[in-house]
Every structure is written in C-alpha cells, then in structure tokens.
Amino acid sequence: EVTVYGKAVGKRVNQIIKSVIKKDMTNYQKVQAVHNWMIRNVKYDYYSLKRGYVPSVSHTAKGALLKKVAVCDGYSHAFQMVMRKLKIPCRFVTGSSGSVGHAWNMVKLSGKWYHIDVTFDDPIINGTNTNKKPYYTYFLKSSSVMKKTHHFTASKYPTCNSKKYD
C-alpha cells in the first residue's frame, strides 16, 4: 500500500507541476503557483477537526494530494514535496499557533529563507468560504512577522530575517 500511494503521490506532484509551472517562471512565481494550487484544490479537514477526530491520512501529503483533504501538516508535507521536485529548498516547520500545535514551511529564494503557511492562507479554513481566492497573509514572511501568530524554536530552523515580502 505504501508503494502504491507513494507512486500515486509522486504522480500527483508531477501533474501539479505540469499544470501550474511554466518554463520561464521565476522561483518566486513557482512558489506562488504551488501555494495557489494547494489553496484551490485542498480542503481543510475542518469537519473532522470539529468532530474531535482527524484521520491520520489528513496529516499526510497523501491526504492533501490524493484525497484533497488535510490539516496543517498534510498541507505542509505536500507543499514541501512539490518544492523538492522543483528543486526549491523547503523546510517543514513545527510549532504552534495560539495553544494549538501547527505546521508550516520555510522556502529559500535568492539565498534567503522565508516562512510560508499555506494552511492559514486558505480562506476556507472555517469551512464556510467557497471563494477559494488565496490569501497572502503568511506568504514569504520574515520570522518577526510570523512570531506574532506562530511559535517555534528558531534555533532549529534557518534564519528568516529578510523583510522583502513583509
């Protein structure tokens, strides 16, 4: 089963790249295109969370890419897989937001690291908005911006001190 899903996830990553990435895109544009694809195609598993039980698949890239339902770590694992395939350095970050555990990513563009939280940029996180227009509140942000809402052990991750996109 792992091999079958591994191949299917890899195939989906390739399909995403083929559908949203153009040859002349900059890495910034690639990151934005994948961010937007995730928001338009993956639904936050709000209903399972509300019921008090989130199935393990919602925590995985498989959940995000094949089932198209995930929570934060599923979004983040899937985003990281696509970035790796595009050869854009990307880290999986764990921490919290408020009193709840949370996961997001860091990406490296032009030699500098930035935070990116696809989950929190998804406008249907509360299960009500069907617009699917991406937010950019947590798109390529510095640690100083992220620390206002996200808590993490900075020493475990690259420094994100560029304020270029803040």
Regions found by a protein language model. Name each.
Residues 74-144:
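Hydrophobic/aromatic-rich core segments of domains that either
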Residues 129-166:
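Low-complexity, Gly/Ser/Thr/Pro-rich intrinsically disordered linker/tail segments
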Residues 57, 64-71, 75:
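Secondary-structure capping and boundary motifs in well-ordered enzyme cores
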Residues 4, 66-70, 94:
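Alpha-helix capping and helix-loop boundary segments enriched in small/acidic/polar residues
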Residues 1-13, 138-143, 151:
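Non-catalytic ligand/cofactor/substrate-binding and regulatory segments of enzyme domains
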Residues 3-64:
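Secondary-structure boundary elements
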